[in-house]
Amino acid sequence: MTMTDPVADMLTRLRNANSAYHDTVSMPYSKLKARIAEILKAEGYIADWSEEPARVGKTLTLSLKFGSNRERSIAGVRRISKPGLRVYAKSTNLPRVFGGLGIAILSTSSGLLTDKQAGKKGVGGEVLAYVW
């Protein structure tokens, strides 16, 4: 069966594994998901990610990050632009997640960027998700 929204599936797997205090979470690999994982690692929300071969295709494995007393580094994840309702933001009207404490992940003409990076480059795009 085909998946209509692979990004939402990735974020749901991440949210569920984080809530259950799992150390890792695996999902089918795609370039878009790998780029989202790179952003999450660069922003400090996950410890690491890896691409592993599977019987069919590849698997993307995320290593989740927890604090000293098993505090979650990800408080919440929300999918914004969906296949049925795309959400776009201009460079002059980029979203701020919790006053700058979280990040918005945007798909721009310059690739996937956070809201801060898109603001510096002066580009807008499709708002994929919020992470805080």
UniProtKB/Swiss-Prot annotation:
Transmembrane segments: none annotated. It comes from the Bacteria. Keywords: Ribonucleoprotein, Ribosomal protein, RNA-binding, rRNA-binding. GO terms for molecular function: rRNA binding; structural constituent of ribosome. GO terms for cellular component: ribonucleoprotein complex; ribosome. GO terms for biological process: translation. Belongs to the universal ribosomal protein uS8 family. NCBIfam families: PRK00136.1 (NF001109). One of the primary rRNA binding proteins, it binds directly to 16S rRNA central domain where it helps coordinate assembly of the platform of the 30S subunit. Part of the 30S ribosomal subunit. Contacts proteins S5 and S12. This is Small ribosomal subunit protein uS8. It comes from Kocuria rhizophila (strain ATCC 9341 / DSM 348 / NBRC 103217 / DC2201).
